[in-house]
A protein has these predicted regions:
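Duplex nucleic acid-engaging cores and interfaces of nucleic-acid transaction enzymes
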Residues: 2-197
């Protein structure tokens, strides 16, 4: 590892996104709104609250015009957030996360367009059909052949359902025990109580 790579290996999702946002030419207010959205992402990279709710929390006012303006700024900032890496970040649910990634593949020409379109249609259906791998019902919903439906399902399976996962610091989730018991020889020392299991 190079020193830079090692430092980035423990970079948080928030830091990663904020670093990318520095290259965007934004007004001070728009930069603040984007930062606010980034800081409200969960560990998986999802935005759990609605833009309206976030705007109300930030505005501190009941003035409808100010709230509408702030919601508009949040909408623009969310589009910018969706343009950052990892693809799918800022989604408000699994279906949207998958759709963002599929649209990215489509724009970059990294997958056959007809398969991506079928996958997008699948993601617009109730996701329990996909989870159950209900090919017949997905074929009906998409109007695609079995082969194309299966190809679309395979494409979806390759996507990252939790785009923030690689940034979660595993070390912070380690539980340190209060007591560690080790065996010293064949017998417990005389000063320790007997434990029966």
């Amino acid at each position: 590892y190079k020193r830079q790579d090692l430092a980035r290996a423990h970079e948080s999702l928030t830091d990663h996104l904020l670093r990318q946002s520095l290259s965007l030419h934004l007004s001070e207010l728009d930069r603040y709104v984007l930062r606010f959205l980034i800081e409200n992402l969960n560990d998986d990279g999802y935005l759990e609250e609605s833009l309206q709710s976030l705007a109300e929390g930030l505005a501190g006012t009941d003035d409808p015009e100010q709230l509408d303006e702030l919601v508009h700024r949040f909408t623009v900032a969310l589009r910018l957030l969706h343009s950052l890496e990892p693809v799918g970040v800022g989604a408000q649910g699994l279906a949207e996360c998958l759709q963002l990634q599929l649209n990215h593949l489509l724009q970059r020409g990294e997958a056959e367009a007809s398969v991506v379109e079928t996958a997008l249609t699948i993601c617009a259906q109730p996701l329990d059909l996909l989870a159950r791998r209900d090919v017949r019902r997905l074929m009906q919903a998409t109007g695609s052949s079995e082969e194309r439906t299966r190809m679309a399902m395979a494409l979806i399976a390759r996507l990252e359902p939790r785009p923030g996962r690689r940034f979660v610091n595993v070390e912070r989730n380690i539980i340190v025990p209060d007591v560690i018991v080790t065996r010293a020889g064949r017998r417990a020392s005389e000063g320790t109580p007997q434990f029966n299991v």
